Regions:
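Signature for phosphate-centric chemistry
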Residues: 20-153, 157-341, 345-459
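Fungal secretory targeting signals
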Residues: 1-25
Length: 459
């Protein structure tokens, strides 16, 4: 049995204050950017792969098995959830404006009879199932690494939605093994203190549900025509562009609440809203805990990265950022002898870890237009969808593998193997373990050394 309960989706302030475009300017055509995903099948229709961080999980690429023996570290986001408290108020406010007037546009008629009955923060039944299915998949994929005395070691950040996701994952893992192997959630890390599975350790980053400068500027560009359409179809509603942004959120949230595509999705798909909506999510994460936040955002991922390095090298954790030294110094709460580790977290922490590790290197996003970002690696829909997962595989390879004798590491995000030029990855996108550890200088030196930018080390 699996359970459902809540979430968190943080947004942080931008590192630099940028000159904003004129909000009244006419929007340029918003093109659908090219995806690098080899699998773009959406669970709830083709556009459900571009709902930013509200995207239901989909494998970005087909999984390719590693050459041989592995140790697995998996960092997974909780499953799909209901809106948080603050967005809920804003969604209801915008919806009230529409429902107090007579709607004349045919495509919007359903709104008059729409009842908002979503919960707050908790996992939806679909979100609970996502984590359960992930546990089933993990057992099926890595069966050879599991034995009675070597079950996955599971941790979770203390938010209830994250704890429940971890429990659902262990239930799926056990069910797939016919209850031969029954991993348990061993450690719940309090978000009130040092927690490497949560990005709340830095007071200088705002915990905000409102758009930052870059995102707000983009809202006033991409929603202009959509807002005009909605106001024309509901005379007197008086919607503004921010209202429109929150109304678009109803598509993914109602969909994952009911496990079927919402009428809101069809409305906003007909208005070509989702390419712009996706780019809003990209900006939010990029200037939150991602590359656009200088070193402050990625620094939130240092603690977890150092824990990962400790596991890969079977050495004590060396960190003075967000680790809980009491937990990490105790073999019962931070063992170093397991072949499978599974940690459960939030989307913003995943973004911080990606950025700290040098994954998805991306120059500054143009917050007035996505047109020059068509081939950008920074696509939140493919990085942190609901139930997103980063898997780090440590393996022993022989000369026959094509990578030479020795220990290697590869990193997968939602099944897509990540290129890692910072550690000299080979044609199989494998890095020698020593080279991988050396490449993580930003984390190993507690953010005092530069991060890899994708082409060189940042100054």
């Amino acid at each position: 049995m699996f359970v459902g309960t809540s979430l968190l989706a943080l947004a942080a302030l931008a590192h630099d204050v940028l000159a904003l475009p004129n909000a009244a300017q006419s929007p340029s055509a918003i093109r659908i950017r090219k995806s690098t995903a080899t699998n773009t099948t959406g669970v709830f229709g083709p556009d459900s792969t571009i709902w930013a961080e509200d995207t239901p999980y989909f494998p970005v690429a087909d999984y390719v098995a590693p050459p041989s023996n592995c140790e697995i570290d998996q960092l997974e986001r909780h499953g799909a959830r209901y809106p948080k408290k603050s967005p809920t108020k804003k969604i209801k406010s915008a919806l009230k404006k529409l429902q107090k007037v007579t709607i004349t546009e045919t495509s919007m008629q359903f709104i008059s009879n729409f009842t908002y009955d979503l919960g707050e923060d908790d996992l939806t039944p679909y979100g609970a199932l996502q984590s359960y299915d992930a546990g089933v998949e993990a057992y099926q994929r890595y069966t050879s690494l599991v034995e009675a005395n070597g079950l996955p070691f599971v941790r979770a950040s203390s938010s209830q939605r994250v704890v429940d996701s971890a429990g659902n994952w262990t239930a799926g893992f056990a069910a797939a093994s016919n209850s031969v192997y029954t991993p348990v959630l061993s450690v719940i890390i309090s978000e009130d203190g040092n927690d490497t599975l949560n990005d709340g350790s830095c007071a200088a980053l705002s915990d905000s549900d409102s758009p930052g400068d870059q995102e707000a500027a983009w809202i006033d560009i991409y929603t202009v025509n959509i807002t005009d359409y909605l106001n024309a179809g509901a005379p007197g509603a008086g919607l503004d562009n921010t209202d429109t942004q929150y109304l678009i959120e109803l598509c993914p949230f109602v969909t994952v609440a009911n496990s079927e595509r919402s009428e809101w999705c069809d409305l906003f798909s007909s208005l070509d809203a989702f390419p712009g909506f996706e780019y809003y999510g990209d900006l939010d994460k990029y200037y939150g805990t991602g590359w656009g936040q200088g070193d402050l955002g990625p620094a939130q991922g240092i603690g977890y990265t150092n824990e990962l390095l400790a596991r890969l090298t079977n050495t004590a954790v060396n960190d003075s950022t967000s680790t809980d030294t009491t937990l990490d110094s105790n073999p019962a709460t931070f063992p170093l002898n397991r072949t499978f580790y599974a940690d459960f977290t939030h989307d913003d922490l995943l973004i911080a870890v990606y950025s700290a590790m040098g994954l998805f290197p991306t120059p500054a996003l143009n917050y007035s237009s996505p047109d020059d970002q068509e081939t950008s690696a920074w696509r939140v829909s493919e990085m942190t969808p609901f139930a997103a997962r980063m898997v780090v595989e440590r393996m022993s390879c022989s000369d026959e593998s094509g990578s030479g004798d020795g220990e290697y590491v590869r990193v997968l995000v939602n099944q897509a193997v990540q290129p890692m030029p910072s550690c000299g990855s080979d044609d199989n996108d494998l890095c020698a373990l020593d080279a991988f550890v050396e490449s993580q200088a930003f984390a190993r030196n507690i953010g005092m050394l530069p991060r890899y930018t994708g082409q060189h080390w940042a100054e």
